[in-house]
From Swiss-Prot:
Keywords: Ribonucleoprotein, Ribosomal protein, RNA-binding, rRNA-binding. It comes from the Bacteria. Disulfide bonds: none annotated. This is Small ribosomal subunit protein uS15. GO terms for cellular component: cytosolic small ribosomal subunit. One of its GO terms (biological process) is translation. The gene is rpsO. PANTHER family: RIBOSOMAL PROTEIN S15, BACTERIAL AND ORGANELLAR, SMALL RIBOSOMAL SUBUNIT PROTEIN US15M. CDD domains: Ribosomal_S15p_S13e. NCBIfam families: S15_bact (TIGR00952). PROSITE patterns: RIBOSOMAL_S15. Belongs to the universal ribosomal protein uS15 family. One of the primary rRNA binding proteins, it binds directly to 16S rRNA where it helps nucleate assembly of the platform of the 30S subunit by binding and bridging several RNA helices of the 16S rRNA. One of its GO terms (molecular function) is rRNA binding.
Length: 87
Protein backbone atom coordinates (compact mmCIF):
# COMPACT_ATOMS: atom_id res chain seq x y z
CA UNK A 1 0.00 0.00 0.00
CA UNK A 2 1.36 3.40 -0.93
CA UNK A 3 2.16 5.95 1.74
CA UNK A 4 -0.28 8.56 0.40
CA UNK A 5 -3.19 6.10 0.25
CA UNK A 6 -2.46 4.88 3.77
CA UNK A 7 -2.36 8.44 5.11
CA UNK A 8 -5.62 9.27 3.30
CA UNK A 9 -7.36 6.28 4.92
CA UNK A 10 -6.00 7.21 8.35
CA UNK A 11 -7.22 10.80 7.93
CA UNK A 12 -10.67 9.60 6.89
CA UNK A 13 -11.23 7.22 9.83
CA UNK A 14 -9.24 8.75 12.71
CA UNK A 15 -11.11 9.64 15.89
CA UNK A 16 -8.81 12.51 16.93
CA UNK A 17 -5.82 14.39 15.53
CA UNK A 18 -3.05 11.95 16.49
CA UNK A 19 -5.08 8.75 16.08
CA UNK A 20 -3.40 6.02 14.03
CA UNK A 21 -4.25 2.84 15.93
CA UNK A 22 -7.93 2.93 16.83
CA UNK A 23 -9.96 -0.11 15.76
CA UNK A 24 -11.68 1.96 13.05
CA UNK A 25 -8.36 2.93 11.45
CA UNK A 26 -7.00 -0.61 11.70
CA UNK A 27 -10.17 -2.08 10.16
CA UNK A 28 -10.11 0.45 7.31
CA UNK A 29 -6.44 -0.27 6.53
CA UNK A 30 -7.00 -4.02 6.65
CA UNK A 31 -10.03 -3.68 4.37
CA UNK A 32 -7.94 -1.82 1.78
CA UNK A 33 -5.22 -4.49 1.92
CA UNK A 34 -7.82 -7.28 1.70
CA UNK A 35 -9.45 -5.68 -1.35
CA UNK A 36 -6.07 -5.25 -3.06
CA UNK A 37 -5.05 -8.85 -2.34
CA UNK A 38 -8.43 -10.15 -3.52
CA UNK A 39 -7.87 -8.51 -6.91
CA UNK A 40 -4.37 -10.03 -7.05
CA UNK A 41 -5.74 -13.51 -6.34
CA UNK A 42 -8.34 -13.21 -9.11
CA UNK A 43 -5.43 -13.03 -11.57
CA UNK A 44 -3.01 -15.37 -9.77
CA UNK A 45 -5.26 -18.21 -8.69
CA UNK A 46 -2.45 -20.53 -7.54
CA UNK A 47 -0.76 -18.02 -5.24
CA UNK A 48 -1.48 -20.00 -2.09
CA UNK A 49 1.04 -18.12 0.03
CA UNK A 50 -0.82 -14.85 -0.53
CA UNK A 51 -4.15 -16.60 -0.01
CA UNK A 52 -3.02 -17.64 3.48
CA UNK A 53 -2.03 -14.06 4.24
CA UNK A 54 -5.44 -12.92 3.03
CA UNK A 55 -7.22 -15.36 5.35
CA UNK A 56 -5.10 -14.17 8.29
CA UNK A 57 -5.98 -10.54 7.51
CA UNK A 58 -9.69 -11.36 7.25
CA UNK A 59 -9.52 -13.14 10.61
CA UNK A 60 -7.71 -10.20 12.20
CA UNK A 61 -10.30 -7.77 10.83
CA UNK A 62 -13.11 -10.00 12.10
CA UNK A 63 -11.54 -9.96 15.56
CA UNK A 64 -11.29 -6.16 15.55
CA UNK A 65 -14.91 -5.91 14.40
CA UNK A 66 -16.03 -8.26 17.18
CA UNK A 67 -14.14 -6.18 19.74
CA UNK A 68 -15.76 -3.00 18.44
CA UNK A 69 -19.20 -4.63 18.48
CA UNK A 70 -18.77 -5.63 22.14
CA UNK A 71 -17.41 -2.27 23.30
CA UNK A 72 -19.37 0.27 21.22
CA UNK A 73 -22.15 -0.92 18.91
CA UNK A 74 -22.69 2.56 17.40
CA UNK A 75 -19.07 2.79 16.23
CA UNK A 76 -19.32 -0.78 14.91
CA UNK A 77 -22.41 0.03 12.85
CA UNK A 78 -20.81 3.23 11.54
CA UNK A 79 -17.63 1.49 10.33
CA UNK A 80 -19.57 -1.39 8.73
CA UNK A 81 -21.74 1.16 6.91
CA UNK A 82 -18.77 3.28 5.77
CA UNK A 83 -16.81 0.31 4.44
CA UNK A 84 -19.82 -1.57 3.02
CA UNK A 85 -18.96 -4.72 4.95
CA UNK A 86 -21.40 -7.56 5.43
CA UNK A 87 -23.09 -8.13 8.81
Amino acid sequence: MQKELKQEIINKFKLHETDTGSPEVQIALLTERINHLTEHLKVHKKDYHSRRGLLKMVGHRRGLLNYLMKTDIARYRAIVEKLNLRK
